Amino acid sequence: MTTIVSVRRNNQVVIAGDGQVSLGNTVMKGNARKVRRLYHGKVLAGFAGGTADAFTLFERFEAKLEMHQGHLMRAAVELAKDWRTDRMLRKLEALLAVADAESSLIITGNGDVVQPENDLIAIGSGGNFAQAAATALLENTDLGALEIAEKSLTIAGDICVFTNQFKTIEELSY
């Protein structure tokens, strides 16, 4: 799987992800880009789960963003509805972490849209490690969102065998 972490602090939101693609116990690729900018660069998105599944979801989510003029919550809810009801989409196994200047959300394959506490998201196989690290850094340091996301992803990569140290980081200031 992978690790994706999103941190919001001081008018900045960041989504960061590692680059490892695994097939069973084998590393197939180490530099995959699992974090992207969508909707004219105003929305950040990262995925954990099957790579092909996630690209399908990115395309669908971007279409929903266009349909709803970039309104993140509305697009997320509409994607989640489709994910629950469409037979093809229901088979996709991935999680999306998405954020814009106002909200950070997790979109699940069960059709859930979750707005996390403290605007902190950590998903994927190393998500628990990244979340613990990011929480500690948020509560005990004055580091910015970018530094917290990067450090928590590094810690997750040191612990989780399905997470490596290749990082893709996107940030949005508002």
Swiss-Prot record:
Compartments reported by the entry: Cytoplasm
Annotated GO MF terms: metal ion binding; threonine-type endopeptidase activity
Residues annotated for Na(+) binding in this entry: 157, 160, 163
EC number: 3.4.25.2
Active site: 2
Family matches, as PROSITE patterns: PROTEASOME_BETA_2
Name of the top EC class for this enzyme: hydrolase
Origin: domain of life: Bacteria
Main localization of the protein described in the UniProt heading: cytoplasm
Any single GO CC term annotated in Swiss-Prot or TrEMBL for this entry: proteasome core complex
Keywords: Allosteric enzyme, Cytoplasm, Hydrolase, Metal-binding, Protease, Sodium, Threonine protease
Swiss-Prot/TrEMBL GO biological process terms: proteolysis involved in protein catabolic process
Keyword Protease in annotation: yes
Similarity annotation: Belongs to the peptidase T1B family. HslV subfamily.
Function: Protease subunit of a proteasome-like degradation complex believed to be a general protein degrading machinery.
HAMAP family: HslV (MF_00248)
Subunit annotation: A double ring-shaped homohexamer of HslV is capped on each side by a ring-shaped HslU homohexamer. The assembly of the HslU/HslV complex is dependent on binding of ATP.
Protein name as annotated: ATP-dependent protease subunit HslV
The species this protein was found in: Shewanella amazonensis (strain ATCC BAA-1098 / SB2B)
Gene from which the chain derives: hslV
